[in-house]
Every structure is written in structure tokens, then in C-alpha cells.
């Protein structure tokens, strides 16, 4: 009996840490987009969540970024910090979206209603049911959470939707 429990526990841990996946590529792409919507725009209305997902899709369609959703979401090249308040202890992994570099489990979806909404919006955006409301933005930031990034001076602001400022 203990061997069965050990086996089930091992399989559960492998699934939890995404060591292997039974999802097809389309499902995986939708899930990556949903995770990004949840972590980047959890407190936003649907319009803000759609806008954040539009940026990911705009990046996928750009020659300057990877060509699939998961690669865009987990792309590394922006710095993050262990202590986000004092901006000390930089982490050498650079992240496009800060939640992908947070030193905590990033799949803890404690706000179930927002997670459900993020999944629904992700699927609809993936299927092309929502037009781009950001005017082609490939970047955004929330000034309540971070200082104005250096790249904002070099890009054109397209919209302010919810708490996020969008640029291309």
C-alpha cells in the first residue's frame, strides 16, 4: 500500500511542477496566456485583461519577439529584484513579465473568480474573438507598481486601459 501512495505522490509532484504535460500545444498556449493575464491583470476589469493579452499576441506577431505565446510569456531579458521595494539584490534572470521570475510558486491561483475569468478571456483572445484594443502595443506597465521604465521614453504611448499604460 505504501508503494502506491509513494507512486501517486511522485506523479502528483511531477504534474504540479509541470515536469511532463498531457496538454496539447494549443491548450498549453492558452494556459500560458491565462497565467499571464491572471498575474499581470488580476485586479483589472475584463477590458484590462484583454489588453494585457493583446500585448502578448502582438509580440507573437512581431519579428522582435518569440513566435508562440509561452515563449513570449517566459522570455528572459528584463531584470527583477528579490526585494522589490528597495530594489536590491538583482536576480540575474531577466524577465519580460515579473511574475515569471518571482521567487514563489507562480501557479497559486488564490483568486478563483479572477483565474476563471483569465482562462475564459485567454481562450477567446487565442481564438481571435477579441480585436486588439491596444492599437498594436507590445509593451505595458502599471505605474502603481513600478517606476516608468526606460523603454517608455523610446516608444509611443497608445492607450491607458485600467491601471496599465500601453506602448508600441
Protein language model features and the residues they cover:
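Bacterial extracytoplasmic/cell-wall-associated proteins, especially those involved in peptidoglycan
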Residues: 24-168
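Classical Sec-dependent N-terminal signal peptides that target proteins to the secretory pathway
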Residues: 2-23
Amino acid at each position: 500500500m505504501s508503494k502506491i501512495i509513494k507512486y501517486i505522490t511522485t506523479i502528483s509532484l511531477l504534474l504540479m511542477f509541470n515536469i511532463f504535460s498531457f496538454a496539447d500545444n494549443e491548450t498549453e498556449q492558452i494556459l500560458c496566456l491565462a497565467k499571464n493575464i491572471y498575474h499581470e491583470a488580476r485586479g483589472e476589469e475584463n477590458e484590462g485583461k484583454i489588453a494585457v493579452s493583446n500585448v502578448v499576441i502582438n509580440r507573437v506577431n512581431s519579428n522582435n519577439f518569440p513566435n508562440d505565446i509561452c515563449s513570449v510569456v517566459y522570455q528572459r531579458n528584463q531584470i527583477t529584484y528579490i526585494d522589490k521595494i528597495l530594489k536590491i539584490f538583482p536576480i540575474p534572470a531577466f524577465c519580460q513579465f515579473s511574475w515569471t521570475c518571482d521567487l514563489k510558486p507562480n501557479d497559486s491561483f488564490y483568486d478563483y473568480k479572477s483565474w476563471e475569468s483569465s482562462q475564459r478571456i485567454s481562450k477567446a483572445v487565442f481564438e481571435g474573438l477579441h480585436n486588439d484594443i491596444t492599437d498594436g502595443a507590445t509593451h505595458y506597465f502599471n505605474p502603481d507598481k513600478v517606476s516608468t521604465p526606460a523603454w517608455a521614453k523610446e516608444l509611443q504611448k497608445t492607450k491607458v486601459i485600467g491601471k496599465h499604460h500601453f506602448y508600441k
